[in-house]
Amino acid sequence: MNTTVSGARIPIRPDDVVLAVLPFFHVYGLTSVLNICVRHACTMVLLPRFDAAAALDLVERHGITRISAVPTMLIGMVEDPDTGRDLSSVSQVVSGGSALPQEVLRRFEAKFPRATILEGYGLSESTSSVAVNVSREERRVMSIGKPLWGTECRVVDAEGHLLGPGEDQVGELLFRGPTIMKGYYRNPEATAATLVDGWLRTGDMGYRDEDGFIYVVDRKKELILRGGYNVYPREVEEVLYEHPDVV
């Protein structure tokens, strides 16, 4: 189901060549790379252990068109010093697993002249993606896009009350839909704490804008209370990445 709805949201063709750098034992690599390539009969080029230089060599050698990766991999490819490779075959990059700094997105798309980075979001408990941006024209930078087909999202406060749209309406992200797990194996207590009336509690803090795009602020556990203000590590990281002396 997840492979089908993900492929419908971000179209993939049989002539696509996908760089497989994510482990297949993880739900992200299993669903968004292996299963989607099998489902749509496209070519996969395997890289068993990630190395930025090796990944870029494969891009040039095989004419890679699509990459699914985590931000640390994209950072490695951006910072590789060899600028002589032809990377123009890459048209689409899906980033997930953690937040992608905006400065990294800018530098990556400058290095890969035809590439568009699309951020998405998912969990093992949701069998991978529940939301994703779909194109350069429609994406909202810093957002994880909109829910996939059949999936709903709501934002709630600490008491479980529904929050409306707006950057000042930060709460926990909850998802409900056909790809959400039935429960944890032989662990009814954990299941009851995570699934509430069919809604998956993600433990991630975020908000929605007026157009339905979802923004992840940070993990609920990582919120820092300082002088009456909510400080999220991701916001600090964004500022650091923009500083010219930070590599």
Could you tell me what each predicted segment is?
Residues 2-17, 25-66, 80:
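Conserved AMP-binding/adenylation subdomain of ANL enzymes
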Residues 14-15, 90, 197:
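Phosphate-coordination loops involved in phosphoryl transfer and adenosine-cofactor binding
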Residues 39, 61-69, 78-140, 149-152, ...:
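Gly/Ser/Thr-rich phosphate-binding loop
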Residues 59, 67, 177, 182-186, ...:
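AMP-binding/adenylate-forming catalytic core of the ANL superfamily
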Residues 97, 122, 145, 204, ...:
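Active-site glycine-centered loops adjacent to acidic/histidine catalytic or metal-binding residues
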Residues 142-148, 194-197:
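Short Gly/Pro-enriched turn/cap motifs at secondary-structure boundaries
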Residues 154-174, 193, 210-211:
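Conserved beta-loop-beta connector loops within the AMP-binding
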Residues 166-181, 199, 205-206:
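AMP-binding/adenylate-forming core of the ANL superfamily
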